Amino acid sequence: MAYPVQLGFQDAASPIMEELLYFHDHTLMIMFLISSLVLYIISLMLTTELMHTNTMDAQEVETVWTILPAAILILIALPSLRILYMMDEITTPSLTLKTMGHQWYWSYEYTDYENLCFDSYMVPSSDLKPGELRLLEVDNRIVLPTELSIRMLISSEDVLHSWAVPSLGVKTDAIPGRLNQATLMASRPGIYYGQCSEICGANHSFMPIVLELVPLKHFEEWLLSML
């Protein structure tokens, strides 16, 4: 859950998001070390009068500044590629949820069950109950089980949308005529908020996403009440 004046990421609630946070810290440390080294060299150049005016060739230096950046790029690329493959991997999902974007609401269909589908609209500010969040609450939440692999099938009925839930590390474009796929697995119960992350028209800001992640037993009880 985000909070005002937040500078960092939201707390990770899925294995994918945890990996993304580790990769962010890994890359940020490399960037910090490189920036510190460059600033140190610049400060030396500005504060000293020593210089080599007759240097015409320095093969050792050229070799170092060719090999070192290549090694750094490899250190960044390898974990990045690993996470990309993890995000695309779909292994025998326990549940499939089809998501369709509209101007300006979402519709959901639990494809493993017959006639279990609904639309999800933002709750107007005038109808909010105490404790509910402005521009983030919906009339019908998605209810999903925790610790199970869930396949998301995402598309759009009209224009480009993007289905994004930061805490779960999910952001997939909803494109008309194309069915995109994503994996979702929550590591703990909770209510997670997201929004459409692709400018899609006048009411783009009013397309919230709310996921209620519950233990499997509670999910089965919810299913019985909906079917």
Curated annotation (Swiss-Prot):
UniProt keyword Metal-binding, yes or no: yes
Localisation: Mitochondrion inner membrane
Cofactor note: Binds a dinuclear copper A center per subunit.
Keywords in alphabetical order: Copper, Electron transport, Magnesium, Membrane, Metal-binding, Mitochondrion, Mitochondrion inner membrane, Respiratory chain, Translocase, Transmembrane, Transmembrane helix, Transport
InterPro entries, per the entry: CcO_II, CcO_II-like_C, CcO_II_C, Copper_CuA, Cupredoxin, Cyt_c_oxidase_su2, Cyt_c_oxidase_su2_TM_dom, Cyt_c_oxidase_su2_TM_sf
Binding site for Cu cation A2: 196, 198, 200, 204
UniProt-listed GO biological process terms: ATP synthesis coupled electron transport
Topology, Mitochondrial matrix side: 46-59
Transmembrane segments: 15-45, 60-87
Catalysed reaction equations from the record: 4 Fe(II)-[cytochrome c] + O2 + 8 H(+)(in) = 4 Fe(III)-[cytochrome c] + 2 H2O + 4 H(+)(out)
Bilayer topology term: Multi-pass membrane protein
Mitochondrial intermembrane compartment residues: 1-14, 88-227
Annotated positions binding Cu cation A1: 161, 196, 200, 207
Gene Ontology cellular-component annotations: mitochondrial inner membrane; respiratory chain complex IV
Residues given in the record as Mg(2+) binding sites: 198
Coiled-coil residue spans: none
Cofactor: Cu cation
Main location, first listed in the record: mitochondrion
Enzyme Commission code(s) on record: 7.1.1.9
Subunit-level organization: Component of the cytochrome c oxidase (complex IV, CIV), a multisubunit enzyme composed of 14 subunits. The complex is composed of a catalytic core of 3 subunits MT-CO1, MT-CO2 and MT-CO3, encoded in the mitochondrial DNA, and 11 supernumerary subunits COX4I, COX5A, COX5B, COX6A, COX6B, COX6C, COX7A, COX7B, COX7C, COX8 and NDUFA4, which are encoded in the nuclear genome.
Protein name: Cytochrome c oxidase subunit 2
Taxonomic source organism: Hapalemur griseus
